[in-house]
Amino acid sequence: MASEQDRPDVKRHRARWRTYQGLIDPKRLVFIDETWTKTNMTRLLGWAPKGERLVDKVPHGHWKTATFLAALRNDRIDAPCLYDGPINGERFRAYVEQFLAPSLKPGDVVILDNLGSHKGKAVRQAIRDVGARIVFLPKYSPDLNPIEQVFAKFKTLLRKAGARTYEAVSDASAQILAQYAPDECAAYVTNAGYA
């Protein structure tokens, strides 16, 4: 838990949010975020015979970073996108306009964290233009965004895949996304307090 959650202003905002959570139909919620991936990811844990060290190979000095963006709904992962390189305001705006907005319906509630690139005027407008609302989570509250749970599993499976090129990361990402069942997505949303 972030120590900033103990600040009085953050506590108040989180308490208000907890009340708000119960007022929204989970079927209308769309949680957005991004996470990084690298071509040198490997498993963090594993098994080896007793007395032997577990060894896995990773490239050093020759790896690439990519950014994975997606939306979590109550029954699916929606609008997935993988960018070669880091995210910035322009790329996030392009993601919203090209991937997210076409997947939204009037009445949807898009929930984001407080990253600066999420608050751009063009981003907010693209979401509102389709009749959806945009709501920002309380500061220092990743625990209130269930897509963080999705990303934890996603990265674990990506590490297991051992993808070493951008194309391999892209292919592995598609295979991993196919593994998220509707009831699993609903469980993430419920576990974060929505429902």
Model regions and ranges:
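Short functional hotspots at interaction and active-site rims
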Residues: 1-195
